[in-house]
Amino acid sequence: MSAWSCPPNVLFENPYLDPEESAKIVGCEEFCRHGYEAQQKSIVLLKNSAKRAPEGQKGVLPLKKGLKVYIPERKIGPSKAFFRIDLPAKTEDPLPDGLPSKYGTRVSSPEEADVALVFIESPACNPYSTEDLANGGNGYLPITLQYRPYTAKKAREVSIAGGDFRENFTNRSYLGKTNTAYNEADLDNILECRRAMGDKPVIVCATVNNPMVMHEFEAEADAIVAEFGVSRAAVLDVVFGDYNPTGRLPIQMPKDMDAVEEQ
């Protein structure tokens, strides 16, 4: 589409802004406050066990302020971005700006800590394999909602719909194929923290981008907090009791991958 064919009186009819007027609207204090409150309200408390709760509390959350907190780094394997651009493996700090001092002190090992705070993301994977295609397959892999390797034993033999119009086949079945989440190490972090922390609490904070199978770690977590892309500050408000969580799950969490395939 050439520039000459664009409608003349729409988006760029008046391209000039009034900075003073923009400052009143974009990022104004009132709007930011409402936005932050919306983030807090969306956070869901999925589990709050009494097993390691402080005396006088029904659950382990909220945490008392002033504790020593261990927060492991996340390890993410090679993945694909938009247009299937290759992304290399990386290690990232889930709290790059540090733990605010009003909540507690971040320590470098579980042995020093009073509590472990493990940030994870729902399992993510690459659902297509050029290697599978080169070896005579159709290239399609199962989309796994669990961290450990998943083999699709109960998938359809023939897919409901065909694939790309450029393909010379219509069956995208992935029956019998295996896939693994590229953030499988999130599960390792939870299990390793559970072993290292002994009888001290482990709190899991999950960024939920899609449904996930939680049976792999639910028993190892004293509390599970789910959020859908909010700021870390809002999550910490819930964990340390500055905000009482009121959110509800907008999606179903499957028991296992068999339940996903059979629905």
Which residues are covered by each model-predicted region?
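C-terminal non-catalytic regions of proteins with extracellular/luminal or membrane-system context
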Residues: 1, 17-263
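Long, well-ordered, tryptophan-enriched scaffold segments
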Residues: 1-17
